[in-house]
Amino acid sequence: MMGSKMASASRVVQVVKPHTPLIRFPDRRDNPKPNVSEVLRSAGLPSHTSSISQHSKGSKSPDWLMHQGPPDTAEMIKTLPQKYRRKLVSQEEIEFIQRGGPE
């Protein structure tokens, strides 16, 4: 009977023992989040309001239409090794998806 009390007492100590995380995260309170407009200015991208005002004036520049994402995205995709590129979808697979599965 004494052995079971000792076993349960040691279990309690194991449960109460504080958990120490193995991963250390940086203290985020010291690093304030940057403002979106500041980030865009530092990246050299046009801000949202300036691009809207240019677009609404009727000046449809081909640059605006071509660059929907970051300017270097297309170049990054071209430099990726084949194993990381998106696989092409065959015509048979497209038809299968379009009809919603097997017939």
Swiss-Prot record:
CC per GO annotation: mitochondrial inner membrane; mitochondrion; oxoglutarate dehydrogenase complex
Organism expressing this protein natively: Bos taurus
Family indicated by similarity: Belongs to the alpha-ketoglutarate dehydrogenase component 4 family.
UniProt keyword Iron-sulfur present: no
Gene Ontology molecular functions: protein-macromolecule adaptor activity
Low complexity bias spans: 47-61
Region (Disordered): 23-70
Function: Molecular adapter that is necessary to form a stable 2-oxoglutarate dehydrogenase enzyme complex (OGDHC). Enables the specific recruitment of E3 subunit to E2 subunit in the 2-oxoglutarate dehydrogenase complex (OGDHC).
Key word Nucleotidyltransferase present: no
Database matches in PANTHER family: 28S RIBOSOMAL PROTEIN S36, MITOCHONDRIAL (PTHR31601), ALPHA-KETOGLUTARATE DEHYDROGENASE COMPONENT 4 (PTHR31601:SF2)
InterPro entries: Kgd4/YMR-31 (IPR020373)
Gene name, Swiss-Prot/TrEMBL: KGD4
The protein's name in its UniProt record: Alpha-ketoglutarate dehydrogenase component 4
BP terms from Gene Ontology: 2-oxoglutarate metabolic process; tricarboxylic acid cycle
Keywords: Acetylation, Mitochondrion, Phosphoprotein, Tricarboxylic acid cycle
Record's subcellular location: Mitochondrion
Modified residues (N-acetylmethionine): M1
Modification Phosphoserine, positions: S61, S90
Subunit structure: Component of the 2-oxoglutarate dehydrogenase complex (OGDHC), composed of OGDH (2-oxoglutarate dehydrogenase; also called E1 subunit), DLST (dihydrolipoamide succinyltransferase; also called E2 subunit) and DLD (dihydrolipoamide dehydrogenase; also called E3 subunit), and the assembly factor KGD4. Within OGDHC complex, interacts (via N-terminus) with E3 subunit and (via C-terminus) with E2 subunit.
